[in-house]
Protein backbone atom coordinates (compact mmCIF):
# COMPACT_ATOMS: atom_id res chain seq x y z
CA UNK A 1 0.00 0.00 0.00
CA UNK A 2 1.10 3.55 -0.74
CA UNK A 3 0.09 6.69 1.13
CA UNK A 4 -0.80 9.82 -0.85
CA UNK A 5 -1.03 12.91 1.36
CA UNK A 6 -2.44 16.26 0.26
CA UNK A 7 -1.45 19.24 2.39
CA UNK A 8 -3.81 22.08 3.27
CA UNK A 9 -5.87 23.64 6.03
CA UNK A 10 -9.34 22.31 6.96
CA UNK A 11 -12.62 24.16 6.59
CA UNK A 12 -14.41 26.27 3.99
CA UNK A 13 -12.45 29.39 4.97
CA UNK A 14 -9.27 27.90 3.48
CA UNK A 15 -10.71 25.68 0.75
CA UNK A 16 -9.73 27.91 -2.18
CA UNK A 17 -6.36 29.04 -0.79
CA UNK A 18 -3.15 28.57 -2.75
CA UNK A 19 -1.81 26.71 0.31
CA UNK A 20 -4.58 24.12 -0.22
CA UNK A 21 -3.60 22.94 -3.68
CA UNK A 22 -2.52 19.63 -2.11
CA UNK A 23 -6.11 19.03 -0.95
CA UNK A 24 -7.36 19.99 -4.42
CA UNK A 25 -5.01 17.48 -6.04
CA UNK A 26 -6.15 14.66 -3.76
CA UNK A 27 -9.82 15.48 -4.34
CA UNK A 28 -9.23 15.23 -8.10
CA UNK A 29 -7.43 11.88 -7.72
CA UNK A 30 -10.24 10.54 -5.52
CA UNK A 31 -12.89 11.57 -8.07
CA UNK A 32 -11.03 10.19 -11.09
CA UNK A 33 -10.24 6.84 -9.50
CA UNK A 34 -13.63 6.34 -7.80
CA UNK A 35 -12.16 6.27 -4.32
CA UNK A 36 -14.21 5.18 -1.32
CA UNK A 37 -16.14 7.96 0.45
CA UNK A 38 -14.00 10.19 2.64
CA UNK A 39 -14.19 9.34 6.34
CA UNK A 40 -12.75 10.87 9.49
CA UNK A 41 -9.64 8.92 10.41
CA UNK A 42 -5.98 9.52 11.31
CA UNK A 43 -6.70 13.11 12.43
CA UNK A 44 -7.90 13.89 8.94
CA UNK A 45 -10.08 12.74 6.06
CA UNK A 46 -9.07 9.39 4.60
CA UNK A 47 -10.13 7.34 1.61
CA UNK A 48 -8.84 4.36 -0.34
CA UNK A 49 -8.51 3.84 -4.07
CA UNK A 50 -6.89 1.46 -6.52
CA UNK A 51 -4.60 3.27 -8.95
CA UNK A 52 -3.56 0.91 -11.71
CA UNK A 53 -2.69 -2.20 -9.70
CA UNK A 54 -1.70 -0.31 -6.53
CA UNK A 55 -3.83 0.11 -3.43
CA UNK A 56 -3.46 3.70 -2.20
CA UNK A 57 -4.57 5.39 1.01
CA UNK A 58 -5.51 9.03 0.40
CA UNK A 59 -5.14 11.37 3.38
CA UNK A 60 -5.98 15.05 3.94
CA UNK A 61 -4.74 15.99 7.44
CA UNK A 62 -7.16 18.18 9.40
CA UNK A 63 -4.59 19.16 12.01
CA UNK A 64 -3.88 22.47 10.24
CA UNK A 65 -0.76 22.73 8.13
CA UNK A 66 1.79 23.12 10.93
CA UNK A 67 0.82 19.78 12.53
CA UNK A 68 0.37 17.70 9.35
CA UNK A 69 2.99 15.20 10.49
CA UNK A 70 0.75 13.94 13.30
CA UNK A 71 -1.82 12.65 10.82
CA UNK A 72 0.77 11.22 8.44
CA UNK A 73 2.62 9.42 11.25
CA UNK A 74 -0.60 7.89 12.58
CA UNK A 75 -1.66 6.55 9.17
CA UNK A 76 1.84 5.32 8.44
CA UNK A 77 2.02 3.42 11.73
CA UNK A 78 -1.46 1.91 11.39
CA UNK A 79 -0.79 0.44 7.94
CA UNK A 80 2.97 -0.08 8.46
CA UNK A 81 3.69 1.97 5.34
CA UNK A 82 7.37 2.51 4.57
CA UNK A 83 8.51 6.12 4.27
CA UNK A 84 9.54 5.45 0.66
CA UNK A 85 5.86 4.70 -0.08
CA UNK A 86 4.66 8.07 1.24
CA UNK A 87 3.94 10.76 -1.37
CA UNK A 88 3.10 14.32 -0.30
CA UNK A 89 1.39 16.82 -2.63
CA UNK A 90 2.08 20.43 -1.62
CA UNK A 91 2.24 24.01 -2.86
CA UNK A 92 5.67 25.21 -3.98
CA UNK A 93 6.54 28.93 -4.04
CA UNK A 94 9.84 28.35 -5.83
CA UNK A 95 8.19 26.89 -8.94
CA UNK A 96 6.17 28.90 -11.42
CA UNK A 97 2.44 28.26 -11.81
CA UNK A 98 1.60 24.83 -13.38
CA UNK A 99 5.16 23.53 -12.90
CA UNK A 100 5.40 20.13 -11.20
CA UNK A 101 8.49 18.47 -9.79
CA UNK A 102 8.72 15.09 -8.07
CA UNK A 103 11.59 14.43 -5.69
CA UNK A 104 12.48 12.24 -2.77
CA UNK A 105 13.91 13.82 0.36
CA UNK A 106 15.48 17.26 0.37
CA UNK A 107 14.81 20.41 2.33
CA UNK A 108 11.50 21.86 3.44
CA UNK A 109 12.01 25.31 1.84
CA UNK A 110 10.18 26.97 4.71
CA UNK A 111 7.05 24.85 4.23
CA UNK A 112 5.60 24.16 7.69
CA UNK A 113 3.64 21.11 6.56
CA UNK A 114 6.78 19.44 5.24
CA UNK A 115 8.70 20.48 8.34
CA UNK A 116 6.12 18.74 10.56
CA UNK A 117 6.17 15.54 8.49
CA UNK A 118 9.96 15.44 8.45
CA UNK A 119 10.13 15.97 12.22
CA UNK A 120 7.70 13.14 13.00
CA UNK A 121 8.26 10.66 10.16
CA UNK A 122 11.70 11.28 8.68
CA UNK A 123 12.85 13.02 5.52
CA UNK A 124 13.00 10.35 2.80
CA UNK A 125 9.41 10.57 1.58
CA UNK A 126 8.36 11.67 -1.90
CA UNK A 127 7.24 15.21 -2.59
CA UNK A 128 5.08 16.33 -5.51
CA UNK A 129 5.88 20.04 -5.64
CA UNK A 130 3.03 21.98 -7.23
CA UNK A 131 4.16 25.40 -8.44
CA UNK A 132 2.08 28.41 -7.41
CA UNK A 133 4.69 31.12 -8.06
CA UNK A 134 6.20 33.57 -5.56
CA UNK A 135 4.76 36.99 -4.68
CA UNK A 136 8.23 38.51 -5.11
CA UNK A 137 8.77 39.66 -1.54
CA UNK A 138 9.24 37.39 1.48
CA UNK A 139 7.03 39.70 3.55
CA UNK A 140 4.10 38.96 1.22
CA UNK A 141 4.35 35.16 1.32
CA UNK A 142 2.01 34.53 4.28
CA UNK A 143 -0.85 36.53 2.78
CA UNK A 144 -0.18 35.13 -0.69
CA UNK A 145 -0.47 31.45 0.25
CA UNK A 146 -3.50 32.06 2.50
CA UNK A 147 -5.40 33.93 -0.21
CA UNK A 148 -7.60 32.15 -2.72
CA UNK A 149 -6.45 31.52 -6.25
CA UNK A 150 -7.61 34.42 -8.40
CA UNK A 151 -10.46 33.81 -10.84
CA UNK A 152 -7.95 34.05 -13.70
CA UNK A 153 -5.87 31.26 -12.14
CA UNK A 154 -8.68 28.76 -11.67
CA UNK A 155 -8.55 27.31 -15.23
CA UNK A 156 -4.90 26.24 -14.91
CA UNK A 157 -5.43 24.99 -11.35
CA UNK A 158 -8.31 22.80 -12.54
CA UNK A 159 -6.32 21.52 -15.53
CA UNK A 160 -3.31 20.80 -13.31
CA UNK A 161 -5.41 18.79 -10.85
CA UNK A 162 -7.00 16.89 -13.74
CA UNK A 163 -3.57 16.05 -15.18
CA UNK A 164 -2.32 14.87 -11.79
CA UNK A 165 -5.38 12.63 -11.46
CA UNK A 166 -5.10 11.32 -15.03
CA UNK A 167 -1.54 10.09 -14.48
CA UNK A 168 -1.58 9.27 -10.74
CA UNK A 169 -1.34 5.52 -11.43
CA UNK A 170 2.21 6.08 -12.74
CA UNK A 171 3.13 7.74 -9.46
CA UNK A 172 1.54 4.91 -7.48
CA UNK A 173 3.64 2.44 -9.49
CA UNK A 174 6.84 4.30 -8.60
CA UNK A 175 7.30 5.73 -12.10
CA UNK A 176 7.90 9.27 -10.88
CA UNK A 177 9.81 10.51 -13.94
CA UNK A 178 7.11 9.25 -16.32
CA UNK A 179 4.41 10.81 -14.13
CA UNK A 180 6.16 14.19 -14.11
CA UNK A 181 6.67 14.09 -17.88
CA UNK A 182 3.06 13.10 -18.65
CA UNK A 183 1.71 15.89 -16.44
CA UNK A 184 4.03 18.40 -18.13
CA UNK A 185 2.95 17.29 -21.60
CA UNK A 186 -0.73 17.38 -20.64
CA UNK A 187 -0.47 20.96 -19.39
CA UNK A 188 1.61 22.00 -22.38
CA UNK A 189 -1.07 20.51 -24.63
CA UNK A 190 -3.68 22.68 -22.92
CA UNK A 191 -1.62 25.81 -23.51
CA UNK A 192 -0.21 26.24 -20.01
CA UNK A 193 3.50 26.13 -20.83
CA UNK A 194 4.26 29.78 -19.94
CA UNK A 195 1.92 30.81 -17.14
CA UNK A 196 2.84 33.87 -15.12
CA UNK A 197 1.80 34.58 -11.58
CA UNK A 198 -1.15 36.99 -11.40
CA UNK A 199 0.33 40.49 -11.40
CA UNK A 200 3.47 39.54 -13.35
CA UNK A 201 4.03 41.16 -16.73
CA UNK A 202 4.88 39.10 -19.77
CA UNK A 203 8.51 39.49 -20.87
Curated annotation (Swiss-Prot):
Site (Stabilizes the basic form of H active site to accept a proton): 91
HAMAP family: Pept_tRNA_hydro_bact
Residues of the site described as Discriminates between blocked and unblocked aminoacyl-tRNA: 9
Gene giving rise to this polypeptide: pth
Enzymatic reactions: an N-acyl-L-alpha-aminoacyl-tRNA + H2O = an N-acyl-L-amino acid + a tRNA + H(+)
Residues annotated as catalytic: 19
Domain of life where this protein originates: Bacteria
Disulfide bonds: none
GO BP annotation list: protein quality control for misfolded or incompletely synthesized proteins; rescue of stalled ribosome
UniProt keyword annotations, A-Z: Cytoplasm, Hydrolase, RNA-binding, tRNA-binding
A GO cellular component entry from the record: cytoplasm
Family, similarity comment: Belongs to the PTH family.
Summary of the function given for this chain in its UniProt record: Hydrolyzes ribosome-free peptidyl-tRNAs (with 1 or more amino acids incorporated), which drop off the ribosome during protein synthesis, or as a result of ribosome stalling. Catalyzes the release of premature peptidyl moieties from peptidyl-tRNA molecules trapped in stalled 50S ribosomal subunits, and thus maintains levels of free tRNAs and 50S ribosomes.
Entry EC number(s): 3.1.1.29
InterPro entries: Pept_tRNA_hydro, Pept_tRNA_hydro_CS, Pept_tRNA_hydro_sf
NCBIfam families assigned to the protein according to its UniProt record, in alphabetical order: pth
Keyword hit for tRNA-binding: yes
Protein name: Peptidyl-tRNA hydrolase
GO MF term list: peptidyl-tRNA hydrolase activity; tRNA binding
Binding site for tRNA: 14, 64, 66, 112
Organism: Methylobacterium nodulans (strain LMG 21967 / CNCM I-2342 / ORS 2060)
Compartments, as annotated in UniProt: Cytoplasm
Binding partners and assembly: Monomer.
Amino acid sequence: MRLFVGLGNPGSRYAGNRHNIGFMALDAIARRHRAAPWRRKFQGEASEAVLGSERVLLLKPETYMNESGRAVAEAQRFYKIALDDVVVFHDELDLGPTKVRVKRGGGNAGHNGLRSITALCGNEYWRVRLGIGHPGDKALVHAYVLNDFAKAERPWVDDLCDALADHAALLAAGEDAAFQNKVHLALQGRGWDDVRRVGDKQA
